[in-house]
Amino acid sequence: MNCAFCPHHKCYTEGRNCTKYSHEEVCGFYSEDDRRMMRASSATESRNYMKMTRLEESAFFAKELGVKKIGIAFCIGLANEAHFCAQYFKNQGFVVESVCCKVCSVDKDMLELEKIKPGKHEAMCNPRTQAQLLNSAGTELNFIVGLCVGHDMQFTMASKAPVSCLITKDRVLANNPAGAVYSRYWR
């Protein structure tokens, strides 16, 4: 598939199916839990389209699913943003668990990781432990706030709860990676 290079996107505009899968086969890809999540996602989109921020939509979505406990895995560089998000979710009635990327303060030397400043203690980002702690806390839905590229993947793979991203880190573009796509200077 090369949908990114399709000039027409008739799947969206005309109901065209460009794959080998029948509609029945596609529906079979979704378990009942998947369908429940799809219903909550569809309700979030249809009732709040162009009305809510991603943070607000995330709380709405969690309520639609009946979630009570939310986890936040965040980068130390976005600690203030994580605090704001955690407080927002608490104000919406959720129990919130949050874990910083530097949890346990394991030096990068322990895993033979490259350091920004060699010769000094530099705590590694610890996405698998972030996931383990949130798994142990029994979170039902986890959100990423600014985890590094690769660490976000490690966290997602290790999390027992479904994961979504609230804020994507981009150190150069003020955490707005889409800015590179919108700017002619990056093309």
Label the predicted regions:
Residues M1-K69, I76-N80:
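Electropositive, gly/pro-rich neighborhoods at or near active sites that engage anionic ligands
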Residues T53, E122-S136, L147-V149:
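Active-site glycine-rich loop that binds ribose-phosphate moieties when present
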Residues E64-G71, L133-T139:
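Short, surface-exposed connector motifs at secondary-structure boundaries
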Residues I70, V96, V163:
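Hydrophobic anchor at the start of a short beta-strand
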Residues E81, C85-Q132:
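Long, charge-dense
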Residues E81-Y88, D152-A161:
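Short Gly/Thr/Asp-enriched flexible loops that form oxyanion-binding sites at enzyme active sites
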Residues K160-R187:
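Short, flexible loop segments at boundaries between secondary-structure elements
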